[in-house]
Structures are given as C-alpha cells and as structure tokens.
Design a protein with these regions (language model features):
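A short glycine-rich, Lys/Arg-flanked "PGG" loop and its adjoining helix->strand segment in the class I
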Residues: 128-140
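A short acidic, Gly/Pro-enriched loop at the edge of an enzyme's catalytic core
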Residues: 102-112
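A C-terminal cap/extension of S-adenosyl-L-methionine-dependent methyltransferases
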Residues: 207-267
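Class I SAM-dependent methyltransferase SAM/SAH-binding core
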Residues: 56-100
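Short alpha-helix
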Residues: 184-202, 208
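Conserved class I S-adenosyl-L-methionine
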Residues: 1-44, 56, 60, 144-171
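A short SAM/SAH-binding and catalytic strip from SAM-dependent methyltransferases
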Residues: 111-125
Length: 267
C-alpha cells in the first residue's frame, strides 16, 4: 500500500475529532501543546498547520484571531475540519501533503505547526522533505512546532499485553536500532535520532517537551480513573516536568520546537 492509502485507512477507522477532547491523555496532549503555542506565538501571527487533522488546533487558533492556513492529507479529516471551521473567515483549509507545500511561498508564515505528519513518514527522504518544506515556508525568526512519537512508548503501550516479541521485532532490528517502514502505520523515534534530523538545517532548537506523560499506558490499567481534581493536579505536575530529559522517552507524544535562522532551505 502507498503511504496515503495507509494513512487514509488509519483515520477512516478512528474518531480523530474526539481524540484530543475525550481521553485524559488526549486532553493533556492538547493542553501542553497549546501552552507552548500561546507562550511563543506572537500576536496577529500568520500560522500554517500541516497535517491539521480535524482542526483541533487550527480552529482554536482561528477563534483566537490568528490568520490560519490548514493542510490535511486525509479527505475524511478535511471534511470534518471544514465543518468545524464554518464561519471562520480567517481559516482556510486545503488538501495536501507535508512533503510538498508548493502551494505556499517561501518565508510566508510566522509559525508552522506539524503536529501529525511525522507519525506517518517512514523514510529519511520524506522526513527531510517535510522538515525542509516547513522551514522553507516559515519566516526567518519564525517557529516550527513538530510532534513525533517515542518508539519506546509505542513498545510499552502497545505490546505489553502478550505480544512483546512482535512489537520488539516491528520497532527494532536485531541490534536494537529503530526500524521505520510503512506497514507500521505509526512510526516512532528515539529522541536523539529525531533531534539529529535537524542537523545542518537553518534552525535552532528552543524546546523539547513530552505532551502526554504515561497516560496512554495508564488508561489501559483496569479501574484507571483520573477525576477532575486529580487530573488538574497531574497537569500542574506534568507542565513542571515535561521538559526533563530523563522523562522524555516515557511520553507517547513529544513536541520539538525550533526557530528558523537566517538562510533558506531548498524546496
């Protein structure tokens, strides 16, 4: 199957619109991501979200008054995004791929959010094309927010229920080097491996944070519950500790934030 077919199949079988609102791990991921966006995004910024899904972030930012362009690969998600964005004249949504943002000129946006594409890009060429395109369309001094998955969290959240050998073989080779291939659906990275993708690019890392802690794993426990007051306390703890390097691999979702320096990337 082609990558686009794999991604379409994944999101045709799940409710992406509800993921960030109805589960504690999704809520924490959203809270954390928006905290960093609000802390760093200038007023009246022009924002591009690549892999916008159903518009959770694009719609929220447009409602706050930002000028938002959203690009989404999956037709089903795009339809829901447009439905969610009704009445928002400062949000435009188009279908497209993170590896080719040719519809947008160089240095066009104050910030680019790529909060999903790296989950479904499996080859170094595609990783570099997606990152280079995000950097290209960002203004010098602008911000690039890129989400990715921890390969270690994938292993212990998805494969501790009796199929650990399968998960080990799928995510690591015999020498425990991380594997990436399309049939994974979701691909994870070692943190240092992901940071190295930016080597030689005209950017400076300014933050690396985990966004959902261990809640993806915790919710699989029988009887797991996090009532509102307990969740509020956990959020306070999480926001204080989410950049601690030793804890990053325990998060399922991570957020890399960098600032574009002078100079341009090639298309």
């Amino acid at each position: 199957m082609k990558r686009v077919d794999i991604v379409n199949a994944i999101y045709s079988a799940c409710d992406e619109d509800a993921r960030l609102t109805k589960s504690r791990n999704g809520q924490l991921e959203s809270i954390t991501t928006m905290r960093y966006i609000h802390a760093l995004l200038p007023e009246r910024a022009k924002v591009l979200e690549v892999g916008a899904g159903t518009g959770r972030y694009s719609v929220a930012l447009a409602r706050e008054g930002y000028d938002v362009s959203a690009v989404e690969l999956v037709e089903r998600n795009l339809e829901k995004l447009r439905e969610n964005a009704k009445g928002l004249e400062n949000l435009s949504a188009t279908q497209g791929d993170a590896t080719n943002l040719g519809a947008f000129p160089d240095d066009a946006f104050d910030a680019v959010l790529a909060l999903g594409p790296m989950y479904h890009l499996y080859a170094p060429g595609d990783w570099n094309r997606a990152l280079d395109e995000a950097i290209r369309v960002t203004k010098p001094g602008g911000l690039i927010f890129t989400a990715f998955l921890s390969v270690y969290a994938i292993l212990y959240t998805n494969y501790l229920s009796g199929n650990f050998r399968e998960g080990l073989a799928e995510n690591f080779d015999g020498d425990f080097r991380v594997r990436h291939f399309e049939e994974q659906g979701f691909t994870g990275f070692d943190i240092s491996e992901f940071e190295a993708l930016f080597d030689g690019k005209p950017v400076r890392e300014i933050a690396l944070a985990g966004t959902d802690s261990v809640l993806v794993l915790a919710k699989q426990m029988n009887g797991f519950s996090l009532p509102d007051e307990e969740f509020e306390a956990f959020v306070r703890y999480h926001l204080h500790t989410c950049e601690i390097r030793e804890l990053l691999g325990s998060h399922s979702h991570l957020l890399h934030i960098c600032r574009k320096q002078d100079g341009r990337t090639n298309r």
